[in-house]
Amino acid sequence: MSVDHLISPFRDKRIILALSNEIKKLAFKLEKKLVIMEVCGGHTHSLMKYGLLDLMPNNLEFVHGPGCPVCVMPRARLDEAYELASMKDSIVLSLGDMMKVPGSYGSLIQAREKGLDARFLYSPMQALEIAKENPHKKVIYIAIGFETTTPMSASVLLSAKKEKINNLFFHINHILVPQSVSAILEDPACQINALLAPSHVSVISGAQIYAPLVDRFKLPIIVSGFEPVDILESVLMLLKQALNKEAKLEIQYKRAVSYEGNTKAQELVNACMEVRENFEWRGLGNIKRSALKLKEAFASYDAEKVFKEYLSHKTSKENKACKCGEILKGIAKPLDCSLFATTCTPQNPIGSCMVSSEGACAAYYRYKRV
């Protein structure tokens, strides 16, 4: 069944141009440049794909945020995934992009080419079946993502416990959006004065998670959908707040997002996970209380604890020429990087921003090469 009739109004050329004209009229009244961070990689791709940046006036600038979980995963965590795959009788599972990002040993795809058992999953629920089919193997799910995907990992874990599947383990890399944005806004060099907040994250956690950012940093935040009309309407809402010297949290994506979020999904996560005290982010460094871990009651499923002796916990240096860290902070654009589209391409990625389909460099490579 086609859903074109549902999507087409949000891609209507007449509506897009009308919103663009209204944005230009209001932007003319701004006293200073409006620097908008679109936190989510999905927004970055929509801006590029539909040429929305070309419809913006010069005094509106977009900077690309850390809303790509694979992009912000440090090499140490990637190395741990490889080390787990290197164990005897192990099967490592993860979702698509995580398989492609190279750590200091290489990527999980390269591990597979060397004969190690590393597998793509289309759904986290597949981990249960693979564990059942391989009772004498150590099956390790590399769980990654923001608040959006965390309930799925929690559901798999709770199902494994209920079904007494004892050979399935979890390497938890679930991270939290508000804390990463807060770390960026705290930087004295930060010029960002408005935010487009991720909507898929908000479906789960609710728009409420951004309220502390509004209160602390006094800037407007709009939870925006991903279609062109969604984004332009959200920009218009940001402009109106800026002109009225307001700093409020508003939801543009009301057809999917509420203030409270999905409380059932939140309960799943709270049943088995808790906040870590520290977590290292690529490009952003250590951010306190910015990620999740398994609760002690689930320690027997925690790959970091069960297989601690196999994990080196080493740190490895990034390529000095790669600007992925600065791009994730919003202080550089992909075109500022000397490696972009030369040494670093989707076929030969140097940095994680090019590897992930949600990465800013991947978006620029696909839609905005010069």
PLM segments and residue spans:
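Short, conserved secondary-structure transition motifs
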Residues: 174-181, 261-264
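A conserved active-site cap/scaffold subdomain adjacent to cofactor or substrate pockets
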Residues: 171, 189-258
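Internal helical hairpin/lid segments
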Residues: 233-326
